[in-house]
Amino acid sequence: MAHMKSKTLVEKAVDIAKNYKTLYVMGCFGSPMTAANKTRYTQNHSYNKAAARAAMIKAATSDTFGFDCVNLIKGILWGWSGSKIKTYGGATYPTTAAISAGACPDVGADGMIARCTGVSTTGWTSMVPGEAVWMSGHIGIYIGDGLAVECTPKWENKVQITAVGNIGAKAGYNTRTWTEHGRIPWVDYSDHSSGPDTGRHAERGHSKGRPDF
């Protein structure tokens, strides 16, 4: 199975952050907040059942898409397209056969970083766009120029672009310091294989982690 190019992963993540209405919904990999999906996701996880979070989900408009941190990455890799009429926004949950053929399995944030290659706690300025950035229970996508895309209930409560504190704060962005970074095994980095990030790629155009980030 051909893997998604890292450039494509970055562009899709940035597109979601900039051009779609999103909401942090635990266990959701891009579903539009239709009445049926609101019922589904206010019953699927104790985090979503909490009164305040359930109220947010119920108040979301039908053109809002739900994600959590690792499910943002999985949703993109599973073909999310922004469809407002498909249950998972166009993403397709992988079959056992698809996973055997190389598709991304349904792993949590910690499970994903455990499968990444070249995982390191240093070398932040040498990251290439499309790498995963991780802290316990939470994961995001490095997009270049010292920025990441992450879905978190913190700050804007949605898919958002933030500064990677390990590289440095950036004006106009909230800052998160991560613990490790590495290359996602279901992503093809051949388009970013030579040398560190130059910044030129930034801003073009059911989770098992805990939501305390």
Model-derived segments and their meaning:
Residues 30, 146, 154, 184-187:
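Short, solvent-exposed coil/turn elements at secondary-structure transition points
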Residues 135, 141-170:
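Catalytic Cys-His active-site segments of thiol-dependent hydrolases/isopeptidases
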Residues 169-213:
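Low-complexity, Gly/Ser/Thr/Pro-rich intrinsically disordered linker/tail segments
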Residues 129-131:
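Loop/turn positions that initiate beta-strands
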Residues 113-123:
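Short alpha-helix capping/helix-loop boundary micro-motifs
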Residues 1-87, 136-138, 149-151, 195, ...:
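N-terminal capping segments
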Residues 74, 78-115:
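Activation targets extended, charge/polar-rich intrinsically disordered C-terminal tails
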